[in-house]
Amino acid sequence: MSTVEPNAYDPQQVETSAQQFWDATRAFQVDENSDKPKFYCLSMLPYPSGALHMGHVRNYTISDVVSRYKRMTGHNVLQPMGWDAFGLPAENAAIKNKTAPAKWTYANIEHMRAQLKSLGYAIDWSREFATCTPDYYVHEQRMFTRLMRKGLAYRRNAVVNWDPIDQTVLANEQVIDGRGWRSGALVEKREIPQWFLRITDYAQELLDGLDQLDGWPDSVKTMQRNWIGRSEGLEIQFDVRDTTGAALDPLRVFTTRPDTLMGVTFVSIAAEHPLAQHAAKSNPELASMLETLKHGGVSEAELETQEKRGMATGLTAVHPISGEEVPVWVANFVLMGYGTGAVMAVPGHDQRDFEFANKYGLPIVQVVKLREPRNDDEQAWDATQWRDWYTDKSRELELINSAEFDGLDYHGAFEALAERFERKGQGQRRINYRLRDWGVSRQRYWGCPIPVIYCAKCGAVPVPEDQLPVVLPENVEFAGTGSPIKTDPTWRQTTCPECGGPAERETDTFDTFMESSWYVARYTSPNARDMVDRRANYWMPADLYVGGIEHAILHLMYFRFYHKLMRDARLVDSDEPVTNLLTQGMVIAETFYRDADNGGKDWINPADVEIQRDERGRVVGASLIADGQPVHIGGTEKMSKSKNNGVDPQAMVAKYGADTVRLFSMFAAPPEQSLEWNEAGVDGMARFMRRLWVQVHKHVGEGIDDELTKIVALGGPLSAEQKAIRRKTHETIGKVDDDYGRRHSFNTAIAAVMELSNALAKFDDASAQGRAVRQEALEAMVLLLNPITPHASHALWQVLGRGETLLENVPFPQVDAAALVRDALTLAIQVNGKLRGTIEVAADAAREQIEALALAEPNAAKFLDGLSVRKIIIVPGKIVNIVAG
C-alpha cells in the first residue's frame, strides 16, 4: 500500500515514476501480430522549431486521450511521432544564429522530444524519424523518378517571386507590400523552370473521394471542393489580329458564363503571355508596363486585392459571334499559370472586369437581366455602380442585347452556343478545374534534393535508383543569399547516367509538403527498404488524424493525392490515407501592450502583467509588474510570437505537472473550438487533482482488502444513498464512454467525473458496503481519467490496492445496467401542457396509482378546480400531462 500522505500530491514525483515504468516496459510499442482490432491515431507531425507551444500541447493531448481510450477498449493502437524537419525557418535561424540548418534542426529535435516525453504521451518512439534524413527522403526521391518515367512529374516554366538582392525565390508569405521580407528590395516576377506533379490528373477522383470521407468535417470537405473548383463551361476561340490586320495565333478562353458572351468588350491577357511579349517588341510603352508588372507577388490573394492595372496591346480579338474587333489588354490580375492566360472580359457581369473597364474607360454592356427583380435596385442597371446581381446565375436570368439569343435563360444560351461553336469548330464543352498542378520545386537549400541530372545531350535525366539517395550536404556555411549547393561544384557537377558525359545536378529542392504527404504511411514500416512494406496495409488508412483546420487545403489535399500515387504504385491498398479527421481550434490568450515611440505597439507577455478582473473574470485593468504603470488591454488573440502572448508549456508543467496541464487543455473548450488560456482555470484543475488525491488516500486510510472490491456485487441490499452513488457512478461511466469514443467531447467527460467526485465527497457511509460502493466509484474515476491524467491514474490505481500495471491494459469501465434502475422516479405534472408540479412514484408503479397521485398533487389540483379531466397522458419516467376543460 502507498505510503504517500493524503495531502502530498507531488506531480513531478508521480509523473517521473509513471514515465519510468512506461519506458522500462516499452508500454506503447506495438506490432501487427495482434488479434485485437487496430486503431491508428496520430497528430500532424511538428516542425522542430525549438520549443513546444500550447497549440502543440492541445493537439497531441487530444490524440493521446483517444489513443489511451482505444487501448482500454481493446484495440491495438499505434500512436507515432516524427519531425517535419526541412523548411524555411531553419534557413532563417541559420542566418540569425550563424549555424548550419542541420545542426540547428537536430538540436531542436532533441529538446522537443524531451518536452513531449515530459507530457506523458503514449507514443511508440521506436518509429520516430526526421524527414531531413537521407533514409527518409530517399523514398520520395525514388518515387519522383518513377513519376517522371510515368509522365506524372514534368518540368516547365512558371512565374515566381524573385528577390534581386538576395538572388533567391521568395514564398508568397515572404513578400511584404511588394518587397522582400529580408532585403527590402522590390520583388520581381520571374519565369524560371520548375518541376510539377500532375495532381490535375486526379482532380475528379479527389473531388469524388470527398463523398466517402464521412468522418471528415464538412467545412474541410467544402474547402477542398472549392479549391478543386470543378466547373463546366465552354472553351471558345477568339481570332487575333495585329495593328496591320494580319492574323496571329488565336486565343482560347474558358468561361462558365457563355450566356454573357455578347457582353465581351475587350480581352485580358497576362503580362507573360506570348501575345503580350510579341506586341511589346514594337511598343516601348507596353514593354515598360510589362517590366513594371513584373514587380509584386504572384499569390492569388494578392492579385484579388491589388489595384487593377493594365495597358492596351494594340492587338484586337475578333468576337466569335458578332465579328466585331475588341481590344486586347494586358491586365495584372490575369496569370499565365491559370487557364490559358487569357480571359474574355465582360465588365457588365464580372466585378474585376467592371473595375478595370471603369478605370480605363472601356465599354460596359448589359446582356443579362433578372426575370423577376425583387426591388427597384435589381431592376435598374448602372454602368458606374456595381451590384452583386449582375453576376448572380443562381436566379432566373434572361439574355438581352444578345442578337438571336435574346430571351434565352442561362441553360438555353449555354446549349445554343455550345452547339454552334462545336459545329463550326470554334469551341467545345469543357470541364475545368481551379486546381493547378503542384509545383514542387523550391530554390532553397534546406530541403530534399530533386533527383534529376541535366545533360546537354540527353536533357533532364532521373537519377538511377541505385545511385539514390542524392544526399544533401549538411555541413555548410549558410549566409542566406543563395543556396550553398548551387555554388558547390563538387556537389553540383556529375556524370550523365545515360551517355556518361559531363552533367549537372538539379540544385532545387522539394517543397516540404512532399515530406508531409506520405509520412503517415512511413510510420507503419519505418525500417522498410522500400517506401513502405506490407505492414502499411495493416495500419492504413489511419483511423484518426488530428490537426489544425488551417491545413485543410494544401497539406490535406497533397496528402490525399500522394496516397493515391502510392496506391497506383501498389504500395498501399486504400484509396484514402485517413478515415476520420479532427480539426482542433486555436489556443488564444489575452494581449497587453504599450504604445511604442515609432507609432507601433510594444507587446507585453501576460506573465509580466498584473491583471485586475471583475466578478465574471473579465479583464478590467492591467499594469506592468516591473513598474506598476498601466498597460493597454489588447483583446484575446491566437497565441503568437508577434503578440508576445504565448505561454511556455515547460513552465506550466514545472509549476503544475503534466496531468494538470493536460486536464485544463481538455476541459477549457470542446476540441473544435478555440481554447482561451486562463491560468486561473489551470489553478482550478490543480485543485481538482489534489482533491482527487486526497479522496483516494482518505478512503484507503480507512482500510481496504481484497474482499472490498467484491462486496458491491456479492453483498446484500444497498441503502438508498448507496444506490444513488452506484447509479451516479455508472451514469458517469456511460457518459464518459460516449464522450471519449463517439463525441470526442472531452470537456463534458471531465465535468461528469467532477460531478461524481462532488457526489462522493458528500457520501460518508463508513460501513463495509458503503466503503465498497466508494471503492467502486474511485476506481471508476481513476480509470475514466486515465486517458487525460495518466500519471496520477497510474499512481492512484496502486494506492487503491490494484498494483502497478499499465492501465491501458485494464478494460475501460462498463456500465452495470442494474445500477441504473431507480427505485423511485420523479415525474413532472403538466396541466394542459404547463408545468404545475412534481410527484415521486415507485419505479414499478401502476398507471392507476400514477394518475391518482398526479390528480392529487396540490398545485395541479388547484389548476384543475372546476374543470373536467378529459385525458391523462403518461410519458414513462418523465411526464404526466393532464388534459382538462
Swiss-Prot record:
GO terms for biological process: leucyl-tRNA aminoacylation. Keywords: Aminoacyl-tRNA synthetase, ATP-binding, Cytoplasm, Ligase, Nucleotide-binding, Protein biosynthesis. It catalyses: tRNA(Leu) + L-leucine + ATP = L-leucyl-tRNA(Leu) + AMP + diphosphate. A motif ('HIGH' region) lies at residues 46-56. A motif ('KMSKS' region) lies at residues 638-642. PROSITE patterns: AA_TRNA_LIGASE_I (PS00178). GO terms for cellular component: cytosol. Its main location: cytoplasm. Its EC number is 6.1.1.4. It is an enzyme of class 6 (ligase). GO terms for molecular function: aminoacyl-tRNA deacylase activity; ATP binding; leucine-tRNA ligase activity. ATP binds at K641. It is found in: Cytoplasm. Pfam families: Anticodon_1, tRNA-synt_1, tRNA-synt_1_2, tRNA-synt_1g. Belongs to the class-I aminoacyl-tRNA synthetase family. NCBIfam families: leuS_bact. HAMAP family: Leu_tRNA_synth_B. PANTHER family: LEUCINE--TRNA LIGASE, MITOCHONDRIAL (PTHR43740:SF2), LEUCYL-TRNA SYNTHETASE (PTHR43740). This is Leucine--tRNA ligase. It comes from Xanthomonas campestris pv. campestris (strain B100).
